Amino acid sequence: MVTIRPDEISSIIRKQIKQYNQEVEVVNIGIVLQVGDGIARIHGLDEVMAGELVEFEDGTVGIALNLESNNVGAVLMGDGLMIQEGSSVRATGKIAQIPVSDAYSGRVVNALAQPIDGRGKITASESRSIESPAPGIISRRSVYEPLQTGLIAIDSMIPIGRGQRELIIGDRQTGKTAVATDTIINQKGQDVICVYVAIGQKASSVAQVVNIFQERGAMEYTIVVAETADSPATLQYLAPYTGAALAEYFMYKEQHTLIIYDDLSKQARAYRQMSLLLRRPPGREAYPGDVFYLHSRLLERAAKLSSQLGEGSMTALPIVETQAGDVSAYIPTNVISITDGQIFLSADLFNAGIRPAINVGISVSRVGSAAQIKAMKQVAGKLKLELAQFAELEAFAQFASDLDRATQNQLARGQRLRELLKQSQSAPLTVEEQIATIYAGANGYLDILEIVQVRKFLVQLREYLITNKPQFGEIIRSTRAFTEQAEALLKEAIQEHIELFLLREQK
């Protein structure tokens, strides 16, 4: 028979009492009233904050956006197919955050910064809020360093600086994404981290862009954030902020970053869908009243930081799609007013074979020549004016039968200048190549050539300069100015090559 010793029992009870830890856990729980179309109405989340993450029974996460007197409207970050009426919801006490680290370079992730390229997990020890406040006035400095796109038309007439916001606007199928991807390709070797955010696009289009980056060796310094057309509206709305948070991580580490939002029209549509389903009052074009704030708080995060913060930068190239060239619609006018200039792509120019189809007349960079090296200013100073005069003269010449010699010469020069601005996709040019190209056109060296010969001549001239006059490129790179020595070398190269070229063409 087992004997029970009272002293042993009392010592066990004492030990248990000592180990007992009195903790009170307060959990804010609500009940789903209604769910559907990516929206859930919840009753009972009394102390929930605006923008707080809420967790449903099936593990789906949502964001509380509408705080009303008798219920909370939350948007779902998932399909929410397993959520039922009456199921419980828990407030997490957190706001949307993503992990950030250097390991994100070269990866394709979704709006929650989770990898979707099948290459395994991304290790990260830090995290950043998806919605971070933009740098203040004292934290910034004016834009002064150029960000070269590799496209002659942009770098010469609509220059972009590090820390600038430059809108790329145009109808569908006018080459907006091509301008953005060429800019990323041109950052190779420039120590710039690029973030490409694809919002509401076809998965095949995103795959095509990623393939271009991989082929051109651009993926190693690029992060792709993708939410395709079949993603929930909430994730399409969040994707640009996720991209901005990833770019900010590098910016505050004293690095230069470039972020492309492709495109903000689709983000605005996703936000409109969410707002209408949450029964927020519609405004112009059925967009909610705060759609301006949607884009302004995103684009204000792009900055050139002050020397105290390490002079890092975040350059934003948002893309907006227009309908039949209408830039006076709601979203285009909003984004134009927020950004520091716009690159306008024209369907008419694109169809006429002028690619990139940049309408130089109405495109502008408000930072302007502050973001250009001295050499480019010296060579391309009058280019925009000459092209504008040519466009005016060309329109007039259609109705005039007999033109004087000077007008004919001006038209011939303008046609050749327009020809030299044409560029193939994924073929960005270095600054010295651009300067040589513009100099040849602006100083009349191309006037003796037929229009069809211009591009062939320029390609061969650039090759001739690299092989026979390498000092020209060295002078431009080291002094960043178009010196007398550089001009003499370039003149010599052009004259030598024109003779060779004409001899070859006559054969």
Swiss-Prot record:
What EC class is this? translocase
Instruction: State any single GO MF term.
Output: ADP binding
Substrates-to-products reaction catalysed: ATP + H2O + 4 H(+)(in) = ADP + phosphate + 5 H(+)(out)
Membrane-protein topology: Peripheral membrane protein
Give the location in the cell.
Answer: Plastid, Chloroplast thylakoid membrane
Q: According to its record, what are the GO cellular component terms? A: chloroplast thylakoid membrane; proton-transporting ATP synthase complex
What the entry lists under Gene3D superfamilies is as follows: 2.40.30.20, ATP synthase alpha/beta chain, C-terminal domain (1.20.150.20), P-loop containing nucleotide triphosphate hydrolases (3.40.50.300)
**Site description Required for activity, residues in chain:** 363
Annotated residues that bind ATP are located at 170-177
Q: Could you tell me the EC number(s) of this protein?
A: 7.1.2.2
Protein keywords: ATP synthesis, ATP-binding, CF(1), Chloroplast, Hydrogen ion transport, Ion transport, Membrane, Nucleotide-binding, Plastid, Thylakoid, Translocase, Transport
NCBIfam families attached to this UniProt entry: atpA (TIGR00962), PRK13343.1 (NF009884)
Family to which this protein belongs: Belongs to the ATPase alpha/beta chains family.
According to its UniProt entry, the function of this protein is described as: Produces ATP from ADP in the presence of a proton gradient across the membrane. The alpha chain is a regulatory subunit.
Please give the subunit comment from the record: F-type ATPases have 2 components, CF(1) - the catalytic core - and CF(0) - the membrane proton channel. CF(1) has five subunits: alpha(3), beta(3), gamma(1), delta(1), epsilon(1). CF(0) has four main subunits: a, b, b' and c.
Protein name (record): ATP synthase subunit alpha, chloroplastic
Q: Which organism is it from?
A: Cycas taitungensis
Please spell out the taxonomic lineage of the organism that makes this protein.
Eukaryota, Viridiplantae, Streptophyta, Embryophyta, Tracheophyta
